[in-house]
């Protein structure tokens, strides 16, 4: 009797799982499908990474899976042409052509507010050790934008604000995780330094080296890195107040090994800016330029056109001139906008020089089938021969936002 009841429960449970399985699979597929696709006029919508998925049609005056008319349309993706899965936006547009670079550039950036990068206790006149910043609830990575009536746009402004408070409680406006907050801080007289202090170290600027992905000379915009510029101590993305890019050359490289990412080393060649940074975003740095950059004019691939298999990257590991190296695109995903591809370096020359992907190569263009398909963004710490990439289409969208804002 007990065995029969156990068998019946198992059968019922199995039946429930079998009933739920199709819905779970459809939910998984829904989350993996893109929200938007781009097509050239007359191009048929194909999603080769989703073999059984096809469009049911474009709603509007145009029919089915292609159109000759530039515009935006709603498309219903279906399983096998009959089971609707997801409504997406199909944008029909002329294919963009950009100048593909792969050249190094220097970055000089000033943050919006003073970023807290450390704390140090203070010996007060009473002999006790205190830390006003910690007592006020401030944390590593918080961005202080005002103390009292003083806007803290740089380190000197923080010092000025503490001097103005002169030991009185002052309201502190700061940003944490994108949310503006407030607290009260009371500066303490530092006997050793003979000045008013808060017990926090702040930084208002950053500098580094990256790789330029592409330039659109007609629109006067550039794109690089493929990820945000972050503070080296806190890992927080730097909120941009102003920034510029300058000429740079690569002077050396430390090889990447398992557990220890390598790094390109460079130096700025001039203080003269060759571009102004407008966005420091999760998909890279973008800005305006009227400087002529050398490179090859290439079409930008739409995300659905990127394939697993052989590809190339343009990278500069010495001097100022990029070289082409062979890689393999192992995996493609539409789910994470920051990690669309997993790539593996297979070029022996690059492996012997750098060990694979190293810091400073972020932004190196990824080429496939005569098109710009993406940019290198990160190295896998436990395997320096592999790394992540972002779709070029995503970077192009961001660059076009800069161009539109400058009009």
PLM segments and residue spans:
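PDZ domains, with a preference for the canonical peptide-binding region formed by the helix
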Residues: 66-68, 146-179, 383-385, 390-393
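PDZ-domain C-terminal substructure recognizer with occasional recognition of PDZ-binding tails
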Residues: 77-79, 86-88, 92-94, 159-199
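Hydrophobic membrane-insertion alpha-helices, especially the h-region
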Residues: 9-28
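PDZ/PDZ-like groove recognition
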Residues: 110-135, 139
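Interdomain regulatory linker/hinge segments that flank or connect interaction modules
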Residues: 2-3, 57-100, 278-325
């Amino acid at each position: 009797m007990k065995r029969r009841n156990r068998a019946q429960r198992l059968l019922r449970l199995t039946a429930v799982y079998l009933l739920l399985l199709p819905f779970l699979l459809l939910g998984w597929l829904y989350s993996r499908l893109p929200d938007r696709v781009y097509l050239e006029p007359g191009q048929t919508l194909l999603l080769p990474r989703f073999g059984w998925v096809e469009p049911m049609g474009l709603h509007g005056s145009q029919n089915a899976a292609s159109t000759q008319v530039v515009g935006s349309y709603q498309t219903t993706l279906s399983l096998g042409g009959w089971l609707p899965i997801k409504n997406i936006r199909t944008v029909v547009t002329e294919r963009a052509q950009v100048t593909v670079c792969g050249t190094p550039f220097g970055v000089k950036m000033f943050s919006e507010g003073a970023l807290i990068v450390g704390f140090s206790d203070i010996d007060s006149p009473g002999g006790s050790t205190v830390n006003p910043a910690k007592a006020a609830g401030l944390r590593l990575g918080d961005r202080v934008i005002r103390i009292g009536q003083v806007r803290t746009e740089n380190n000197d402004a923080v010092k000025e604000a503490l001097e103005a408070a002169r030991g009185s409680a002052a309201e502190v406006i700061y940003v944490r995780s994108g949310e503006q907050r407030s607290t009260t801080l009371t500066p303490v007289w530092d006997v050793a330094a003979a000045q008013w202090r808060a017990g926090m170290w702040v930084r208002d600027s950053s500098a580094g080296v990256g790789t330029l992905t592409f330039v659109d000379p007609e629109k006067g915009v550039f794109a690089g890195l493929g990820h945000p510029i972050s503070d080296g101590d806190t890992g927080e993305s730097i909120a941009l107040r102003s920034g510029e890019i300058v000429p740079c050359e690569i002077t050396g490289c430390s090889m990447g090994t398992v557990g220890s990412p390598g790094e390109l080393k460079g130096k700025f060649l001039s203080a003269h800016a060759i571009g102004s940074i407008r966005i420091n975003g999760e998909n890279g740095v973008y800005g305006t330029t009227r400087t002529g950059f050398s490179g090859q004019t290439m079409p930008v691939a739409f995300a659905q056109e990127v394939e697993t298999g052989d590809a190339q990257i343009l990278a500069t590991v010495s001097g100022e001139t990029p070289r082409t190296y062979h890689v393999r695109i192992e995996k493609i995903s539409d789910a994470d906008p920051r990690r669309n591809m997993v790539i593996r370096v297979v070029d022996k020359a690059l492996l012997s020089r750098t060990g694979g992907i190293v810091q400073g190569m972020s932004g190196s263009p990824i080429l496939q089938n005569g098109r710009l398909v993406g940019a290198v963004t990160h190295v896998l710490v436990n395997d320096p021969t592999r790394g992540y990439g972002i779709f070029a289409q995503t970077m192009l969208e961001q660059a076009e936002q800069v161009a539109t804002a400058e009009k």
